[in-house]
Amino acid sequence: MKKADPPASEPPELEALWSSWLVDLGWQPSEPQQQQLQQLYSLVMAGNRTQNLTRITDPIDFWEKHLWDSLRGLRLLGSWDEIQAQPWRGIDIGTGAGFPGIPAQIALPQAHFTLLDSSQRKIAFVQEVLQQLSLAQARAVAQRAEIWGQDPQERGSYDLALARAVAAAEICAEYCLPLLKVGGRAILYRGHWTEAEAQTLKRALSLLGGKLIHVEAFTTPHSHGMRHCLLLEKVAPTPACYPRPPGIPKRQPLGQDKRR
């Protein structure tokens, strides 16, 4: 991907919106971070010309549904001061066009994120974005989560895993938990959330060495859409059989109630 010249559309003028982040996130981007986030918008819009990266193109919708939403989930980890104090080794599973991993990397420059996706084209785009935004502490990798989770160098090596708009929660858990250290945490981004889904997830977590710590419900600031974020913790080593081979987690999800 070449630099947009001119960009697909001008970066959104978001200065008036940053103040709301202090209320919702307990954090505001610095001027260089604002510039990176605005440049991210321009790069995604330019990339959208040649591949289907996102249907969200309105500047305000992009700010809310990609930038704000990506960072809102991190609040489950504690106050922003506490979050920024940790040198996270994180992974964004199913990153797509780079969300939530790129906003998280911009907001947490002390962290080192791996952005994982099975699509070679999307990862090529994300690699170019990381280069143009000078995010040298992040890397983008084209690989399936099931294979990455069985790689001896990657398995059990992450402090934090993020999964947004990837699959059902129990499937995301099978992708995330094997990659975490014991004590590591995963944040699953959901829309609506039901008690039935929670019970399925808990059954899956009992097999994976994980625990559901917290579910937080909130509404988005502009469109007032309902969101839920789930905080998982790895409390025991994940059995070596997980994640199962590619495709099986989606075809045969863990935690299904066999009595039904």
From Swiss-Prot:
Chief localisation class: cytoplasm
Subcellular localization: Cytoplasm
Pfam families assigned to the protein according to its UniProt record, in alphabetical order: GidB (PF02527)
GO function terms (MF aspect): rRNA (guanine-N7-)-methyltransferase activity
EC number(s) stated in the UniProt entry for this protein: 2.1.1.-
Domain of life: Bacteria
InterPro entries: rRNA_ssu_MeTfrase_G (IPR003682), SAM-dependent_MTases_sf (IPR029063)
One GO CC term on file: cytosol
Cysteines engaged in disulfide bonds, as pairs: none
Top EC class of this enzyme: transferase
UniProt keyword list: Cytoplasm, Methyltransferase, rRNA processing, S-adenosyl-L-methionine, Transferase
Binding site residues for S-adenosyl-L-methionine: G94, F99, D117, S118, S119, A145, E146, R164
Family, per entry: Belongs to the methyltransferase superfamily. RNA methyltransferase RsmG family.
PANTHER family from the UniProt entry: S-ADENOSYL-L-METHIONINE-DEPENDENT METHYLTRANSFERASES SUPERFAMILY PROTEIN
Job of this protein: Specifically methylates the N7 position of a guanine in 16S rRNA.
Protein name: Ribosomal RNA small subunit methyltransferase G
Protein source organism: Synechococcus sp. (strain JA-3-3Ab)
